[in-house]
């Protein structure tokens, strides 16, 4: 019977199963493509990952298990394959405003098509697929295409296949001048000069395009251009922000970025050095400078600011910035609660925060403008760096030599306490101060805070003592120069009148604007415990110890603190009544010398003094007393001394070998410190075991840590599992991010570079690869490029070279009628990219055309009217350059992962009236006027200089008409020359009348700068 069927019909019958399969595939709902966008946009806000804000009805729709489990009501939201039992279907089609989903107050009703998608999806089994961006990328073979002679690179076949499927054909190649302008702007941010265009057009060699791209990639301009987008991500600025908005000398980090791009530092190292350069073995100065990426957030020194609040804000900013820059995720949404859309919990956020909060730091800026620690010293030359290494080695050798000195055999029969340089008996006081009992010693002056009559004479241990009110106190104005290598001893009888939360007993730190400004020697009572410190800047650059036990209230105790000048916490000791007491180390990282302030007692400006506390018999030595001397000072008999105290005293006072070794060590330390202090300090990261633990903060509030939710350092396992072999620190985080199988890191940077070349990313939401992201237009291409990028050594220049030499990039940008109708946004890339230049490119182009661009690479930032490239323009966070803001640059207060182009009348006003553009128009007019005197040729040359092409006849005619109109207008306005000065001695210059032709030509040049041809790359 089959043989009776005609051949044509027989072929149709054979094709039926294939056609049915195609129809079935077309009808099959894809979860990631069709369903997830609907659920994410309409449902996840109430039924998503966030459990903290009371997930509605206990229903979770972002995962299969949650969507298909039975609810307390007895209903099941989704029963795969069963529409009648799936409560979601009934809710979608309900007309009751109290029952329908999404609820009317969301103002996002589902369309009929969206309801149909969800219905068919459930009917087909409600299959859940993981979000595409959380699946490791894999390489795909280039698809077959019809126009096989068009692709120049395998990536072109991915583009062409999509275009052909959409019924589009690729555009013809752009002319060579257009391509040259396009590629020059993409790779360097500057257009080619007329001479460069002429040279390229004259090069007819087979590899002319490749040679030009290689030259652009080798230019210093390349790194300057690529750095701008990274500076947006890193929130680079030249001031700290907030009210004071003080100067922030951050440009060494910017210069590191320039060098990294120009030297083609592999992206995995680029990432690692910025996140954790300080944790690399034998970290170099440059690698530590790179970590300033984490320190570029805003800070303040404003009085009344709470250090912990701003410390937490800074850490949160670091987490947010790293999330955007390296993962393309909005992780900051999980600061207050579990992420509404992405599988990032609040614990995940604070585990990341533990990575970035590993600093021993203060949340506030030092009031005096010093670099807030931790920091790295910026030595200018290899010789200076080598000298520092030698001096460090010398300190290490001296420490070993000191520890190698054998125990002393010497003994001292009698211990004599040295005479102090200050002794204040405090038997009485006057309005001017208190007497110093040391012969020739100057009295302690009354510090004019509070009133002397507020002090009280009370019975002391030896005669009278003084009880303080917390405001008034005394200052030893001639007792200064207490350096980090200067030994010191303080002793006094002390009585607490109350359990002070904080009380200043002694300090040389000047006035107080927060712990971050404390600098000098300091003895505090902190919640009843004694804290003895030598401080450069608290808390990172300090040596500090604290008693384990609290002082009793109301009892006299003789407190003695000694410091041996070693810059180490081990050199600090505390004694009570002649006996050393147990202490714990609070800080042990003293990096620099304190400021030179006078010694003050019981008072400090803007801080709590020794309120209701009493002092008697204050003594100060410019040396560190030994334990035996302290015991003798208190009258303890040698028979009561701890074992070994006498031998230690003999070692310190009578052992010549030990004294020589100690002097050599202190000399080595001083020489190292002196050399280090010749180099400026610069912001860096430095891991510290003394960093406070990280807890989940309720609603993200700094003062509401949930102590039962300690968060060790970690990363979201829902994004990519953590390898247990990795260290739980920033270096481990960078290794986790640069794992070749990590689903986000390579995709995010490849997509960002694609967007730089083509205007839009393969994923349009370059800043967001989470569940709210746009789907990739060419997912297989994105994955393949990401895999190739990693396998090629994370080579940024190689990837950009590949993109700009592709047939896709070389296309003309003018759309055909069919392309305009089928693909108005150019998603399928059947034509070349059209890009509005950034604010930096527009400004730099004007300076280059005018011949005034100063091409100095690197160095300190310049003011807006300077003629350097725009990335060097001084960026004040509270008042950014207005011309840049108008062209969509940000304030750099926070990370800006993407600039959104706008078109406003203000942009034309900037181009026509901004002083820099006005001056550039004048310079360009003068330049072309020296080449030719013919107005038409002048206009044509000006246009060609700015726009890198010949003006079209209509453009040239319009500009000539403008020139003629402006020349006539100016000629009519020019006044007659003023009469000569009557007095030959008059120094006043005679105004030269304006040249109508030059004024008109200048206005034509300004118009060219403001034209679409100038501000657009086509």
Model-derived regions: residue spans:
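Short, aromatic/His-centered strand-loop micro-motif at the edge of beta-sheets
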Residues: 533-558
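Extracytoplasmic low-complexity segments
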Residues: 382, 387-471, 509-515, 589-592, ...
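Extended surface/linker regions that mediate inter-domain or inter-protein docking
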Residues: 114, 211-346, 352-353, 357, ...
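Solvent-exposed helix-loop boundary motif
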Residues: 25-165, 177-182, 192-200, 239, ...
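Carbohydrate-binding surfaces in secreted/extracellular proteins
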Residues: 335, 561-585
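Extracellular glycan-recognition modules
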Residues: 269, 283-288, 417-449, 456, ...
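Extracellular glycan-interaction patches encoded by glycine-rich segments
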Residues: 595-616, 632
């Amino acid at each position: 019977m089959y043989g009776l069927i005609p051949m044509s019909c027989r072929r149709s019958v054979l094709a039926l199963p294939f056609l049915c399969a195609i129809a079935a595939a077309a009808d099959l709902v894809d979860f990631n493509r069709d369903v997830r966008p609907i659920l994410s946009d309409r449902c996840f806000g109430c039924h998503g990952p966030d459990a903290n804000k009371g997930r509605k009805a206990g229903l979770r729709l972002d995962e299969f298990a949650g969507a298909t489990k039975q609810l307390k009501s007895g209903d099941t939201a989704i029963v795969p394959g069963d529409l009648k039992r799936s409560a979601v279907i009934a809710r979608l089609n309900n007309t009751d405003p109290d029952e329908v989903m999404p609820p009317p107050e969301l103002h996002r009703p589902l369309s009929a098509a969206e309801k149909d998608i969800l219905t068919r999806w459930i009917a087909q089994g409600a299959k859940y697929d993981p979000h595409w961006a959380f699946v490791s990328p894999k390489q795909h073979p280039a698809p077959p295409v019809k126009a096989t002679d068009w692709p120049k690179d395998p990536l072109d076949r991915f583009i062409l296949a999509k275009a052909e499927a959409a019924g589009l054909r690729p555009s013809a190649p752009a002319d060579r001048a257009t391509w040259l302008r396009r590629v020059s702007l993409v790779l360097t941010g500057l257009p080619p000069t007329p001479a460069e265009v002429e040279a390229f057009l004259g090069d007819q060699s087979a590899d002319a395009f490749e040679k030009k791209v290689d030259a652009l990639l080798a230019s210093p301009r390349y790194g300057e251009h690529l750095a701008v987008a990274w500076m947006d991500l890193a929130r680079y600025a030249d001031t700290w922000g907030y009210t004071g908005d003080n100067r922030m000398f951050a440009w060494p980090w910017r210069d590191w970025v320039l060098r990294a791009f120009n030297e083609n530092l592999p992206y995995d190292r680029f990432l690692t050095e910025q996140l954790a350069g300080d944790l690399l073995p034998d970290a170099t100065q440059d690698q530590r400078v790179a970590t300033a990426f984490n320190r570029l957030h805003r800070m303040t020194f404003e009085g009344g600011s709470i250090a912990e609040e701003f410390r937490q804000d800074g850490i949160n900013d670091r987490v947010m910035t790293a999330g955007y820059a390296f993962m393309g995720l909005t992780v900051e949404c999980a600061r207050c609660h579990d992420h509404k859309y992405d599988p990032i919990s609040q614990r995940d956020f604070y585990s990341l925060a533990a990575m970035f909060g590993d600093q021993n730091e203060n949340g506030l800026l030092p009031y005096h403008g010093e670099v807030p620690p931790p920091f790295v010293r910026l030595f200018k030359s290899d010789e200076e760096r080598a000298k520092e290494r030698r001096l460090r080695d010398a300190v290490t050798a001296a420490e070993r030599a000191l520890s190698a000195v054998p125990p002393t055999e010497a003994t001292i029969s009698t211990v004599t306490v040295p005479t102090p340089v200050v002794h204040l008996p405090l038997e009485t006081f006057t309005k001017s101060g208190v007497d110093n009992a040391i012969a020739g010693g100057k009295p302690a002056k009354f510090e004019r805070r509070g009133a002397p009559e507020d002090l009280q004479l009370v019975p002391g241990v030896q005669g009278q003592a003084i009880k303080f009110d917390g405001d008034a106190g005394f200052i030893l104005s001639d007792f200064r120069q207490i350096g980090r290598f200067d030994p010191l001893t303080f002793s006094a009888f002390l009585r607490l009148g109350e359990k002070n939360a904080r009380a200043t007993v002694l300090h040389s730190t000047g006035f107080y604007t927060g712990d971050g400004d404390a600098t000098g020697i300091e003895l505090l009572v902190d919640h009843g415990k004694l804290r003895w410190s030598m401080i450069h800047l608290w808390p990172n650059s300090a040596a500090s110890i604290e008693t384990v036990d609290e002082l009793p209230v109301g009892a006299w105790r003789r407190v003695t603190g000694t410091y041996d000048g070693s810059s180490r916490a081990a050199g600090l000791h505390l004694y009570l009544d002649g006996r050393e007491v147990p202490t714990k180390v609070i800080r042990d990282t003293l990096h620099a010398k304190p400021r030179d302030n006078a010694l003050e007692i019981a008072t400090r400006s803007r801080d709590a003094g020794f309120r209701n506390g009493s002092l008697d018999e204050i003594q100060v030595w410019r040396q560190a007393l030994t334990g035996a001397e302290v015991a003798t000072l208190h009258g303890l008999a040698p028979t009561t001394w701890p074992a070994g105290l006498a031998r230690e005293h003999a070692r310190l006072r009578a052992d010549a070998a030990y004294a020589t070794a100690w002097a050599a060590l202190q000399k080595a330390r001083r020489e190292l410190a002196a050399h280090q202090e010749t180099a400026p300090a610069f912001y860096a990261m430095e891991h510290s075991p003394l960093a406070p633990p990280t807890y989940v903060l309720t609603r993200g509030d700094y003062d509401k840590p949930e102590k039962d939710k300690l968060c060790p350092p970690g990363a979201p396992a829902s994004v990519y599992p953590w390898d247990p072999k990795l260290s739980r620190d920033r270096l481990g985080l960078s290794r986790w991010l640069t794992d070749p199988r990590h689903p986000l890191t390579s995709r995010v940077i490849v997509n960002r570079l694609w967007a730089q070349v083509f205007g839009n990313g393969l994923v349009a939401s370059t800043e967001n690869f989470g569940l709210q992201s746009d789907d990739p237009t060419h997912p297989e291409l994105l994955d393949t490029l990401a895999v190739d990028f990693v396998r090629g050594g994370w080579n940024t220049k190689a990837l950009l070279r590949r993109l700009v030499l592709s047939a896709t990039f070389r296309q003309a940008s003018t759309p055909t009628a069919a392309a305009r109708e089928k693909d108005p946004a150019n998603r399928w890339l059947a034509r070349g990219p059209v890009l509005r230049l950034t604010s930096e490119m527009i400004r730099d182009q004007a300076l280059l055309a005018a011949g005034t661009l100063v091409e100095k690479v690197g160095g300190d930032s310049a003011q807006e009217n300077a003629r350097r490239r725009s990335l060097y323009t001084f960026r004040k966070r509270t008042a950014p350059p207005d011309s840049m803001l108008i062209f969509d640059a940000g304030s750099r207060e926070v990370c800006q992962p993407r600039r959104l182009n706008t078109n406003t009348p203000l942009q034309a006003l900037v181009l026509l009236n901004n002083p820099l553009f006005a001056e550039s128009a004048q310079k360009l007019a003068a330049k072309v006027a020296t080449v030719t005197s013919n107005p038409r040729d002048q206009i044509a040359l000006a246009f060609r200089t700015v726009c890198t092409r010949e003006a079209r006849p209509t453009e040239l005619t319009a500009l000539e008409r403008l020139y003629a109109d402006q020349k006539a207008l100016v000629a009519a306005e020019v006044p007659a020359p003023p009469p000569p000065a009557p007095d030959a001695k008059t120094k006043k210059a005679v105004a030269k009348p304006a040249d109508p032709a030059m004024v008109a030509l200048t206005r034509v040049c300004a118009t060219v700068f403001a034209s679409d041809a100038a501000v657009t790359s086509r």
